[in-house]
Amino acid sequence: MNIFRDFEKKLEGLFEGVILRAFKRGVHPVEIGKKLARECEGNKTIGVSRVYVPNRYEVGLSPRDHSRFESYQAVLATELENLLITYVKEHGYAVLDRPRVKLVEVGRLREGEFWIKSRMEGELPQPHEPVETDDGILRPRDTGGPAVLEIMDSGEG
């Protein structure tokens, strides 16, 4: 599966690069949002009872694109983080804490080019040995281990 995903990413990069250079200038936030969702989807980790997705995202931008976003970078990052939260909710995924997006300048990128790197920061909850109680029933041990943020839909629109 990874071979196909890598191949798809290479084709996507070639295609997007040609199209971007031919028809437009600069990166638009909507493009970053779409690519963040793909990055999230492509880097799932299947846990014992949940599917985890990355919670840290770094967006590499050309110097020119980075400077265009500079005056509202914090607002844009928050908007992209909220987009990821919505995506996580809609797909029933779990994250170790609130997703964070950081925009960084990468000198070797040309205007309109960008990349995204993601990772999981924190620890996945570990399964624990059950404890036998006085009544002979095995119950999960309360370990006070790492917290997991599971985003649930409240049903409010």
Segments and roles (model prediction):
Residues 1-19, 23, 129-130:
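RNA-contacting regions in translation and RNA-metabolism proteins
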Residues 2, 20-27, 65-70, 80-82, ...:
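Generic detector of short, locally flexible boundary/turn motifs and exposed helical patches
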Residues 9-20, 48-71:
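Short glycine-rich, basic-tinged beta-strand/loop micro-motifs
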Residues 15-19, 30-42, 78, 82, ...:
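Intrinsically disordered, low-complexity acidic Ser/Thr-rich regulatory segments
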Residues 24, 45-51, 64-76, 87-96:
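Short acidic, glycine/proline-enriched loop segments that cap or flank alpha-helices
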Residues 24-43, 49-58:
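Short secondary-structure junction/hinge motifs that connect adjacent elements
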Residues 58-60, 100-103:
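Extended hydrophobic secondary-structure segments that form protein cores and membrane-embedded regions
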